């Protein structure tokens, strides 16, 4: 696999994209840093060039605001967790439709080994995908699956039509991932998106997503990082203490894991695991759900 890290000084800024989309460069920077470790959890040769200087600036600012390296560790754990989730769906269960909602600068189409005939759909804003395509094209990267981009705003009611036009078959099994998005949306938008996903998925299809709890908004040590996000135009808006209830309302049975638990540690989580029964703490949830 070609190493594209020498292009770190390029900046694939999606002109016209909103600030939520810009957080994807922070995630790419975290993946790039992880990829440089000898004990890396994954290898993402495209991450550094996609992050650009702005992405590494995001990462530095978020870690400074948090007073720790958790803003760089959490994306790494989340990435590996959902890598395993997606590959299990395709390799063990035989799913051949993968949908990345708000794909941002995700590179799974290029760095994971997909089974033959896998179709991977990346949905995001036109400006985000255009800038990403330009950077990937310059890197001469080639996907390991059939990759289709769907340039549309997920907050527009008509986005499902764009996905269907690209060949997605809702009557067939699929696996979806909504990663790094719901925290930034209004409650009504979260429910609308989940309901649209339900309407587009067959029974037993799978959905992965991440959530924050409500306690994050009321925990003073977390306020500096929340303020840093707000200054960059990406304030947190949504949290839930009961992901299972949220998903059940839209027809999904959810299995919920916290970073630090077995299966979501990978030797990267720096804090002791605290059970959900202990109140008053901020929490993040990694959710694997099935359309029931």
Model regions: which residues?
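A short, conserved alpha-helix within the catalytic core of class I
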Residues: 147, 157-161, 184-199
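Rossmann-like AdoMet
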Residues: 1-99, 103-150
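S-adenosyl-L-methionine
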Residues: 137-170
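A short SAM/SAH-binding and catalytic strip from SAM-dependent methyltransferases
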Residues: 168-189
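Core SAM-dependent methyltransferase catalytic element
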Residues: 267-292
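Conserved beta-strand signature within the Rossmann-like core of class I S-adenosyl-L-methionine
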Residues: 175-177, 194, 199-215
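Short, glycine-/aromatic-enriched active-site segment of Class I SAM-dependent methyltransferases
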Residues: 218-233
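Short alpha-helix
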Residues: 234-259
């Amino acid at each position: 696999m070609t190493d594209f890290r020498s292009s770190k000084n390029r900046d694939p800024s999606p002109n016209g994209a909103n600030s939520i989309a810009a957080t994807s460069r922070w995630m790419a920077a975290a993946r790039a840093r992880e990829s440089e470790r000898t004990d890396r959890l994954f290898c993402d040769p495209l991450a550094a060039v996609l992050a650009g200087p702005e992405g590494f600036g995001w990462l530095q600012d978020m870690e400074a605001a948090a007073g720790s390296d958790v803003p760089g560790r959490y994306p790494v754990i989340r990435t590996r967790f959902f890598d395993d989730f997606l590959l299990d769906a395709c390799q063990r269960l035989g799913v051949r439709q993968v949908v990345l909602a708000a794909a941002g600068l995700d590179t799974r189409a290029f760095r994971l080994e997909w089974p033959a005939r896998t179709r991977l759909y990346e949905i995001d804003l036109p400006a985000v995908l255009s800038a990403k395509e330009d950077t990937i094209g310059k890197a001469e990267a080639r996907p390991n699956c059939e990759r289709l981009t769907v340039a549309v705003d997920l907050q527009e009611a008509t986005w499902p039509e764009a996905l269907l036009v690209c060949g997605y078959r809702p009557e067939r099994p699929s696996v979806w991932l909504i990663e790094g998005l719901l925290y930034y949306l209004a409650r009504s938008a979260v429910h609308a998106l989940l309901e649209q996903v339900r309407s587009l998925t067959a029974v037993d299809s799978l959905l992965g997503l991440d959530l924050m709890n409500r306690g994050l908004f009321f925990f003073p040590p977390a306020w500096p990082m929340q303020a840093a996000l707000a200054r960059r135009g990406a304030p947190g808006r949504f949290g839930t203490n009961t992901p299972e209830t949220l998903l059940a309302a839209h027809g999904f049975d959810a299995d919920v894991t916290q970073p630090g638990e077995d299966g979501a540690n990978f030797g990267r989580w720096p804090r002791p695991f605290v059970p959900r029964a202990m109140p008053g703490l901020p929490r993040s949830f990694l959710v694997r759900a099935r359309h029931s």
